[in-house]
């Protein structure tokens, strides 16, 4: 199988999984034009669309794609039912498309009904996790997002995380400001700066690496706890997660 990212808008990525027969699955098509262009250039035959949440920069291209390819099944959470979804899915369900079986995880936080799709080794996480960071909490709570991160962190370390936005540079600048002495964070921040200076993508990423550089996965890390303790005493990892999210919101 082939994993392809299609840039959209200013910093979105629309993900495509294609098999050796050029059949493909499209994830979070926020706009149709770049997807239709890629379909024509690669000779793909779209079979299905996966939606992680209802925001327009993830669903805006669905009507045009379904008009062009009327056979498309569109899988998404309840909150996308009025965005073109033909099959509503939720936590614990499995979706079989071609040779891929996608497990569905409920990951509330960014939105209340956000979901992720996992088909080893790929995780399509929408706006739940970004490299070095996490999604803004528009509808959910820090506690919900913390639990969503625990689900992702329970996946195998070789999981390939397909985030929906190129936010890595800003996230690593924030992480480096929190733990300026952390070698893994500083090294990755330097690597990301080099990639973005060349206008190269930083995605996808591997869960094993995220565990080292993503502070939102390190809420039990002693260095982070000591940093937070300089300002306030927080006993629970959910509280430290909320502290990080608040700091990032105001960074």
Swiss-Prot record:
Q: Which reaction does it catalyse?
A: an S-(2-hydroxyacyl)glutathione + H2O = a 2-hydroxy carboxylate + glutathione + H(+)
Which keywords accompany this UniProt record? Hydrolase, Metal-binding, Zinc
Q: Where are the transmembrane segments?
A: none
**What's the cofactor?**
Zn(2+)
Q: Name one GO molecular function term.
A: metal ion binding
Q: Report residues binding Zn(2+) 2.
A: 57-58, 127, 165
- Known function: Thiolesterase that catalyzes the hydrolysis of S-D-lactoyl-glutathione to form glutathione and D-lactic acid.
Against HAMAP family, the record matches this protein to: Glyoxalase_2
PANTHER family given in the database record: HYDROXYACYLGLUTATHIONE HYDROLASE, HYDROXYACYLGLUTATHIONE HYDROLASE GLOB
The protein depicted here goes by the name Hydroxyacylglutathione hydrolase
């Amino acid at each position: 199988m082939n994993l392809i990212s299609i840039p959209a808008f200013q910093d979105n990525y629309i993900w495509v999984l294609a098999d050796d027969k050029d059949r493909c699955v499209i994830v979070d098509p926020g706009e149709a034009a770049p997807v239709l262009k890629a379909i024509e250039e690669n000779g793909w035959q779209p079979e299905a669309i996966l939606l992680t949440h209802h925001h327009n920069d993830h669903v805006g291209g669905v009507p045009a794609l379904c008009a062009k390819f009327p056979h498309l099944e569109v899988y998404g959470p309840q909150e996308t039912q009025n965005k073109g979804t033909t099959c509503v899915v939720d936590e614990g369900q499995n979706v079989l498309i071609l040779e891929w079986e996608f497990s569905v995880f409920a990951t509330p936080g960014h939105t209340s009904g956000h979901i992720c799709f996992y088909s080893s080794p790929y995780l399509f996480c929408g706006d739940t996790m970004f490299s070095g960071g996490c999604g803004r909490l528009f509808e959910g709570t820090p506690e919900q997002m913390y639990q969503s991160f625990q689900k992702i962190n329970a996946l195998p370390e070789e999981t390939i995380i397909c985030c929906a936005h190129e936010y890595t540079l800003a996230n690593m600048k924030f992480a480096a400001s929190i733990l300026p002495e952390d070698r893994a964070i500083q090294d990755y921040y330097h690597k990301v700066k080099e990639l973005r200076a060349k206008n190269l993508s930083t995605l996808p990423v591997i869960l094993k690496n995220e565990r080292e550089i993503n502070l939102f996965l390190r809420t039990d890390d002693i260095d982070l706890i000591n940093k937070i303790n300089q300002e306030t005493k927080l006993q629970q990892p959910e509280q430290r997660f909320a502290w990080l999210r608040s700091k990032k919101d105001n960074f």
